[in-house]
Amino acid sequence: MKEITRKSWENMINLSLDEPFFLYLETPLCGTCKMGKRMLEVALETINTQKDRNVQVGICNINEMPELAEKYGITSVPCLLILSRGIAVKRVYALQSAGNIYQTMIKSLEKEV
């Protein structure tokens, strides 16, 4: 997972032109965000290992880039934002489990195949 900054944001958007790009939005003091991030790490590792993929996930502190919340209609954190061709196609707020995140990511990736 890669930390997203204003400088790296445009490069990350370009990644979504070829396949879905996953952006995890959080704040540093959010306990639920920390748990969600760990579940996302497990799901990502499983996808990249079992499916032989190199799925990219960005992480963004929404306090440092509030314009993303406005642009993509983010109402709370944690949020897993799924971008395809630069457009938000899904927002996931209830990160219930690593398995749930895994299924959400796999479904998004399969739509692009």
Positions of the model-derived regions?
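Thiol-based oxidoreductase modules, predominantly thioredoxin-like and allied folds used
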Residues: 3-6, 25, 44, 48-67
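Typically the conserved alpha-helix immediately C-terminal to a functionally engaged Cys/Sec
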Residues: 34-48
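Short, charged low-complexity linear segments at domain edges
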Residues: 1-18
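The canonical Cys-X-X-Cys-His
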Residues: 30-33, 80
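Mid-chain, well-packed structural core segment of small domains
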Residues: 62-80, 84
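Non-catalytic, surface beta->alpha helical segment in thiol-disulfide oxidoreductase systems
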Residues: 76, 81-113
